[in-house]
Amino acid sequence: MRYNAGSYDIVVIGAGHAGCEAGLAAARMGCKTLVCTLTLDSVAMMPCNPNIGGTAKGHLVREIDALGGEMGVNIDHTFIQSKMLNTSKGPAVHSLRAQADKKKYQERMKKVLETQENLHLRQLEVVSVEVEDGKVKGVLTKNGAFFECKAVIMTSGTYLQSRIIIGDVSYSQGPNGLSNANELSKSLIDLGIDLRRFKTGTPARINKRSVDFSKMIEQPGDEEIIPFSFISGNIDRDQVSCWLTYTNEETHKVIQENIHRSPMYNGSIKGVGPRYCPSIEDKVMRFQDKDRHQIFIEPEGDDTEEMYVGGMSSSLPEDVQVQMIKTVPGLENAEIMRTAYAIEYDCIDPTQLKASLEFKNIDGFFSAGQINGSSGYEEAGAQGIVAGINAALKVQGKDPMILTRSDGYVGVLIDDLITKGTNEPYRMMTSRAEYRLLLRQDNADFRLTEIGHNVGLVTEERWNKFKERKQNLERELERLKELQITNKTENNEKIVELGSTELKKPIRMYELIKRPELDYFSLACLDPERPDLPKDIGDQINIIARYEGYIQTQLEQVAQFKKFEKKVLPEDLDYNDVNSLRIEAIQKLNKIRPLNIGQASRISGVSPADISVLLIFLEHYRKTGKNTDN
């Protein structure tokens, strides 16, 4: 029986990585927030890989943290290994990755939600979102409780009508043996929301006691632990190792002989899978020239024997999985504790969303995370914090926070989803960011903390720490640009000792740092009055000095980009009325409804010629007295 259960400013549907960030952001901004989850035991659950960060994903975590989110702080408290990836490459692609203790990660995040002022965490299944006159009115739960609210954030992950597939066995269930949600999809369809079917998967978990690590290559963490959060400070902690092994011809033979039993290849799976995280059977069949594939054996926590078999995601039958795993060096006697599986689920077409992550046609209804067609904990968390901030701003009667492609990877992620859409689970990569030298993980706070403070999410403690860090960097850069190093014999002897060439004339310290064989730290011997600063300040100085020319070039590109972003398109424009646009462009523009010329130019099917037509139209529109330039 239906009953009125109370009213909230904001209701969040789901408490995965998107839901946690959304709920915390909304509550911390002063909104009375209800976070609903199918089970309280799955808050911030990591049903697949036991790590946070990685290439491009580490950037997202740093940006979530810079805005005032929780993911970075949470992993800093609960990681069991820390590693900086891509250190042999340029700073734009350096990415932090941390192995998590999955249970401790969940437990701490749940505690944060439970103790957050303005936030109510409840075990409830939402079966419908109720809308009246195009505006959200509330949500109805399976138990008949109706919660009135001003905004709803849907962060339902991979649970909507989800189906587990293992070989020829399939059944209705959520990830990791949990129940799914089979009723909410109908409510979304009734609201006119387009759904599609995606697929993802996870590898088996094996018992640590059954693994022969002597046949594998040890992968220890870094000696120097770099935290994800800008407010975590120095971390000193014992770390565990991961282990590397490889598939071989025997592994591939087992897969090839049983490929007809794979639901990926016999048509049982209809959903589209992730291109950049293929199953082991997909890798073996698609890349038959490769005689081996990497397999990482990763611990899932300090208090469990479960090991994650990274690189071996599969939907093959259980008996084939056993054969396959036992062919891998070190896994000959492996005992499977959890079987690998594929999971199909409903998700939305994200082009139905605005840049604020609010549905275009439903006032007050936001969506974030894997329900939007993305993959990964970090992509989910990034969307979650944006949706949470914007739902709170909506309730407060304020303008939304819109992050652009030049603001951060979060902006790139959202712009790609809402502008281009996705036909497969979307994964963030550094190659997707055209301004990646500006969007480094080390400067996320310089790019986004002020934005987080302006919307009311960043705490005063974090804000004061940021201001001190910014002041330290700016003062030190200014000092280095003024400090002159003379070419006297004593200085030249030290420079030669460092492997560089003598000075012919005096030079500023800032210019000397640009020499590839020197850096800020090694030149301390020529700088006796140098202030005692944190190491990360020195790291930033090295990057700023060495890449100054490239950074300036990208800043100029951003200035050009922003010119197009400022050319705002009328919200109510019918593109059928714009003369000379091609039919495909008219269809795409009417569907996506871009905010500005910049976004329009990134829509697939809109050509440079179409953009020229729109620019002429806007100029005429402006001259007739309607201003479209902010």
From Swiss-Prot:
Its cofactor is FAD. NAD(+) binds at residues 273-287. Pfam families: GIDA, GIDA_C_1st, SAM_GIDA_C. The keyword RNA-binding does not apply. It comes from the Bacteria. GO terms for biological process: tRNA methylation; tRNA wobble uridine modification. InterPro entries: FAD/NAD-bd_sf (IPR036188), GIDA_C_N (IPR049312), MnmG (IPR004416), MnmG-rel (IPR002218), MnmG-rel_CS (IPR020595), MnmG_C (IPR026904), MnmG_C_subdom (IPR047001), MnmG_C_subdom_sf (IPR044920). The keyword tRNA processing applies. Belongs to the MnmG family. This is tRNA uridine 5-carboxymethylaminomethyl modification enzyme MnmG. The lineage of its organism: Bacteria, Bacillati, Bacillota, Clostridia, Eubacteriales. The gene is mnmG.
